[in-house]
Amino acid sequence: MRTRSQVWAQKAYEKVREAAKGEGRGEYRDMALKLPVLVRQAGLSQALAFVDSRGKEAHKALGNDLAQVLGYRDLRELAEAAREAELLQYLRLTREVLAAAEWFKRFAQALIEE
């Protein structure tokens, strides 16, 4: 039996490995490095809205990848869940997003060159 963090790590690794092969990998890496800090500073809903509004496919790809790792269809569904969540659910979702985002950050540092 694996922990939730282990499952997220495996899925994040696969997503980042795929992103490392594609166009926009530098932008994907940059956003992966910034996302945990952005969530801590601006809050979950604002951070997700920022990623969605950037207009760059690599940023949206990261948002969608993060959402899928956490069991959501895409970034917009994750953002909707954050907007509609009660306080305790919102705090839990924030912790989950931060935990998964840290895996994306680490794997982006390791797999995507600057």
UniProtKB/Swiss-Prot annotation:
What Gene3D superfamilies does the annotation carry? AF1862-like domain
Coiled-coil stretches noted in the UniProt entry, renumbered to this chain: none
The protein's superkingdom reads: Bacteria
Mind telling me which Pfam families this protein's record contains? Cas_Cmr5
Instruction: Recite the UniProt keywords alphabetically.
Output: Antiviral defense, Cytoplasm, Plasmid
- Gene Ontology terms describing biological process: defense response to virus
Q: Where in the cell is it found?
A: Cytoplasm
Q: InterPro entries given for it? A: AF1862-like_dom_sf, CRISPR-assoc_prot_Cmr5
Disulfide pairings: none
Could you tell me which SUPFAM superfamilies the record lists for this protein?
AF1862-like
**Listed GO cellular component terms?**
cytoplasm
Tell me which family the UniProt entry assigns to this protein: Belongs to the CRISPR system Cmr5 family.
Q: Its function? A: CRISPR (clustered regularly interspaced short palindromic repeat), is an adaptive immune system that provides protection against mobile genetic elements (viruses, transposable elements and conjugative plasmids). CRISPR clusters contain sequences complementary to antecedent mobile elements and target invading nucleic acids. CRISPR clusters are transcribed and processed into CRISPR RNA (crRNA). Part of the Cmr ribonucleoprotein complex.
Assembly, per entry? Homotrimer.
Can you name this protein? Answer: CRISPR system Cmr subunit Cmr5
Origin organism is Thermus thermophilus (strain ATCC 27634 / DSM 579 / HB8)
Gene name for this UniProt entry: cmr5
